[in-house]
Amino acid sequence: MARILWVSDAGRATGFATVTHALGERLAAMGHDIHVLAVGWDAKYPVPGPLQLYRAEAGPARQYLGLDRTLELVEHLKPDIVLTVEDPPMVWRRFMDNRFDPDKKVLKRQPIISYLPIDGYGVPPQWLTLKRLVRVVPYSRFGAEQLDMDPDEAIPHGVEPIWRPFSKAERLTVRAKLGIEPDAFVIGRVDSNSRRKDFASTWKTINMALENGWLPEDKTVALFHTKLIETSIGVNLQTLISRGMGKFMVTNEVDWPVEQVVELVNCFDVTLNNSRGEGWGLNILESLACGVPVIAPDSSSIPEVVGDGGVLIEGRAEMTNPYGVDWILSDPLPMALALREMYNADATLRAKLADAAIKQAAKFNWDESAKRFDVVIKEELAKA
C-alpha cells in the first residue's frame, strides 16, 4: 500500500476537513499510510483516528496554508503519492507558484492526485493545464464536464451514517431544547457565511415570502448555522434581519460537534440554499440524508446532488468571480414561492418529500468513493 501525504483541511469543521477524514480514514483502513498537512488545524488537542496530522503553520515561515511545509514534509516523509483536496487556484499555487519550492521539487518527485471542486462555468486555461501536471479527480460530473473530462471520472462525496432522519419524538425534543414551537415551519441552512454562499439572498427569499403573506410570520422560524457577522468575506446577517420580518435564529458558530449539527438539521422542515455555485454541496446532501427536502438553484453541481430530493429553481443572472469563473445568482422570487408550496404541503406530501430526500442521499456513499480512490492511487503507483 501507499504512503500518502494528504494536503487539505483536517481536524476542524470545514467541508474540506470532512472530506479528508471521510476518505482518508477509509483509505487508511485499507492499508494506506496517510499523513496530513493539516491546513487550519490548531494542534491544541490530538485528533483521534488513523490519520497522522501535521500542523500547516508549524513551518519556518508560519505560513497559514503550509506552503513552506509542503516540500519539507515531502523530503521528511518520502511519500509515494501526494493527494490534495483544495481549490484549483490553491493547487496551482502550491506546486507551480510556490516561493518555498521554486524548483518545483514536489511536482517532479512523485505522482500527485488532486481532488478538485469546480463551482462555476468557464474555467480558466490554467486550471485545464493542471490535467497535464497532476491526476485530476473532479468532485462532480458537472466539474468533469467543465474540465473537458469524462464525467465518469468524477468521484462524488458521500454522507456519514450519523446523518439520519430523527423520529417525530426526537425532532420535537430537539425543537423544545432550542425553544422552537412544535408546529413551527422551520427554514434552515448550514453553511459558511461567504460571498459565494450568498446568505443575503437566503434572507431576501424568506423575507419576501413573509412580506407577501406566503408564510405566516408567527409560525415561521429561520434557523441558520453560520457566523452572524462576516463582513470580510460574507454579509452582516444581523443588519439584514433587523430590516425585515420574522424570527431568525443564528448560531454564530461554525465548529459545533457534528452530533449537534445533526440535531439542528433535524429541526428543519426545508433547507433553503442560495449558493452561487457548489463544487459539490455537502451540506445539501447531509440535509437530504436527514429527510429534509432542499430548495436550491439549478446550477453547478447542485442538481446532481439534489436530484429528486428537492426543488431546483433557475437562476436569474450570471456573475463573474475574481478567477474569471461564472457563478449563477439565485432568484429570490420563485424560491419564495417554492417555500410557500412547501409550507402548504399536507402531511402526506411532506412524508413523500422526506422519503425522496432520503432515497436521493442514499445514492452517495463514502465507502464506494474510497474504493474508487484506492483504484486511482494504485493506477498512479503503477505509472510511477
Please describe what each predicted stretch is.
Residues 5, 181-197, 203-206, 222-224:
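Conserved donor-binding/catalytic core segment of Leloir-type glycosyltransferases
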Residues 39-42, 218-235, 250, 254:
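Glycosyltransferase donor-sugar binding loop
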Residues 132-169:
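Donor nucleotide-sugar binding/catalytic pocket of nucleotide-sugar-dependent glycosyltransferases
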Residues 234-263:
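Nucleotide-activated donor-binding/catalytic signature segment of Leloir-type glycosyltransferases, i.e.
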